[in-house]
């Protein structure tokens, strides 16, 4: 995933499950904002930002996302993405600078655009096996729940 601002961009590795969870939480947040009238009607009805462009090159990962937090501040959705180690613990690279962290301040229409693209990308993948939930190749796959029989 890439986060862009004023000509700069950062690329982070993010798990497919994290993308799904982030999109679901964003959609839930928008519903809560609408229900609680916490955002202006103009912000809530603004069309989603459409971004179908490919990722910027070169694609060099800054870090792998571990912890993600979402907050609502001053009509902005603030997303913090922090690096994590293989043990799912926070990384602290340097005492002075702290862990790798990206903070993205997004408008509601940008969040809607993220949800649209996330759903498009996630649903474009291979279908899941109904028995084991692993991805199924066009020629099938060896299903561990079916004792290795091809499905």
Per-region residue spans from a language model:
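Intrinsic, low-complexity N-terminal interaction/targeting segments
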Residues: 40-101, 105
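Short microdomains enriched in Cys/His and/or Lys/Arg
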Residues: 149-151
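Short, structured motif recognition centered on aromatic/hydrophobic residues
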Residues: 1-3, 22, 26, 77-81, ...
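A cross-family "folded-core" feature that marks the main globular domain of proteins
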Residues: 1-4, 13, 37-38, 52-54, ...
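Short cysteine/histidine-rich zinc-coordinating motifs and their immediately flanking basic loops
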Residues: 140-147
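The feature marks the first
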Residues: 1-32, 36
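Mixed-charge, glycine-accented linear interaction segment located at domain edges/termini
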Residues: 12, 86-140
């Amino acid at each position: 995933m890439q986060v862009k601002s004023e000509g700069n961009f950062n690329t982070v590795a993010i798990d497919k499950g994290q993308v799904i969870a982030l999109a679901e939480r964003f959609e839930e947040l928008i519903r809560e904002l609408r229900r609680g009238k916490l955002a202006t009607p103009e912000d809530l009805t603004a069309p989603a930002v459409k971004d179908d462009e490919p990722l910027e090159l070169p694609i060099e990962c800054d870090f792998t996302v571990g912890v993600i937090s979402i907050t609502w501040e001053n009509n902005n959705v603030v997303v913090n993405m922090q690096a994590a180690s293989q043990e799912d613990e926070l990384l602290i690279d340097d005492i002075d600078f702290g862990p790798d962290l990206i903070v993205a301040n997004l408008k509601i229409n940008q969040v809607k655009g993220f949800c649209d693209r996330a759903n498009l990308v996630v649903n474009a993948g291979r279908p899941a096996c109904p028995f084991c939930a692993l991805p199924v190749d066009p020629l099938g796959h060896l299903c561990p729940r079916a004792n290795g029989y091809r499905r």
